[in-house]
């Protein structure tokens, strides 16, 4: 739960700034007939190349002095047409494109997409595969929150937080590389399973990371949690009410920071999450500070989940053996069996054949709820694929959040929302 602190809130600072106004504006609207500027408003474009927009986002702002009267996010600079691309690719071929949605948590994106396809195909993966997916998803959550926390700290002037966060994330990338062969865009999850089983000693390395990470996390959080400057910049700033969070479709840590105790891993468990004990952190004020606290606690809970998975890690297969029509056969069998060779050829060229129908699945990703709606007319490619992006919903609230705040607070608000433009623009 969030802790209350008695510090000046944004409303008090705005009132002080307004009372101190009256000076000559830096720029004041369009020039009049005499060539002079008139009025008291200034137009300012923030981005699309700006360190505090966390990607290619542009905010078109209007200001009166240092107070924002308008802030319109302009998106689309990273639009690639992912949903249309999906209509011209087999279900397996689209997996790498999901890496590039929330590119800070590709393993979590993979899992959400393949579970949607498995739901369409009526497949159930074995417990070992589910356990692997849970571990990778929670490691991805920690990795994403570390980057969000570090960037947020940098935005408000805490450079050391970024350095320490990136240091811990490097250990995670080593684990990802050992498991998947890639550090960033992994493409590890497959329809009906995963690319390969966990290598020898990998689970022990994950456990060692968890043991070392928790003290490191406490050190990182101690730099911010009771830091007077950080409190001044975040407490009472960018408040999202419960009503606004629901109306705008805000999910994930941003919704939980506003007191909405919802988490799909608890409410609608998938991939075996119902087996694990963990808490859902919830804030009380809905401001930037509460969102920071929620993400910090979520990393602790992710470690708690990972330790339970390792302790009860199941044996058996890491892919659905009955899913021959969707899962590529092992390479050894392809080289020795004509039947397996033909199966691989058909899966690569035609794609896994799906029944006609439609399905929607959503997962609890680090940024919020990531959903995939798939319409199939049968065959190896989807007729329509729609992506429900949490970052898109989070950004839709920016005009309301930034109304009447100081321009310096915009940086804190954007950092606390922790969006990623690859997912928003897709």
Swiss-Prot record:
<keyword id="KW-1278">Translocase</keyword>
<comment type="function">
    <text>NDH-1 shuttles electrons from NADH, via FMN and iron-sulfur (Fe-S) centers, to quinones in the respiratory chain. The immediate electron acceptor for the enzyme in this species is believed to be ubiquinone. Couples the redox reaction to proton translocation (for every two electrons transferred, four hydrogen ions are translocated across the cytoplasmic membrane), and thus conserves the redox energy in a proton gradient.</text>
</comment>
<dbReference type="Pfam" id="PF00346">
    <property type="entry name" value="Complex1_49kDa"/>
</dbReference>
<keyword id="KW-0520">NAD</keyword>
<dbReference type="InterPro" id="IPR001135">
    <property type="entry name" value="NADH_Q_OxRdtase_suD"/>
</dbReference>
<dbReference type="InterPro" id="IPR029014">
    <property type="entry name" value="NiFe-Hase_large"/>
</dbReference>
<dbReference type="GO" id="GO:0051287">
    <property type="term" value="F:NAD binding"/>
</dbReference>
<keyword id="KW-0874">Quinone</keyword>
<keyword id="KW-1003">Cell membrane</keyword>
<dbReference type="GO" id="GO:0005886">
    <property type="term" value="C:plasma membrane"/>
</dbReference>
<feature type="region of interest" description="Disordered">
    <location>
        <begin position="1"/>
        <end position="51"/>
    </location>
</feature>
<keyword id="KW-0472">Membrane</keyword>
<dbReference type="InterPro" id="IPR022885">
    <property type="entry name" value="NDH1_su_D/H"/>
</dbReference>
<protein>
    <recommendedName>
        <fullName>NADH-quinone oxidoreductase subunit D 1</fullName>
        <ecNumber>7.1.1.-</ecNumber>
    </recommendedName>
</protein>
<keyword id="KW-0813">Transport</keyword>
<keyword id="KW-0830">Ubiquinone</keyword>
<dbReference type="GO" id="GO:0048038">
    <property type="term" value="F:quinone binding"/>
</dbReference>
<comment type="subunit">
    <text>NDH-1 is composed of 14 different subunits. Subunits NuoB, C, D, E, F, and G constitute the peripheral sector of the complex.</text>
</comment>
<comment type="similarity">
    <text>Belongs to the complex I 49 kDa subunit family.</text>
</comment>
<dbReference type="GO" id="GO:0050136">
    <property type="term" value="F:NADH:ubiquinone reductase (non-electrogenic) activity"/>
</dbReference>
<keyword id="KW-0997">Cell inner membrane</keyword>
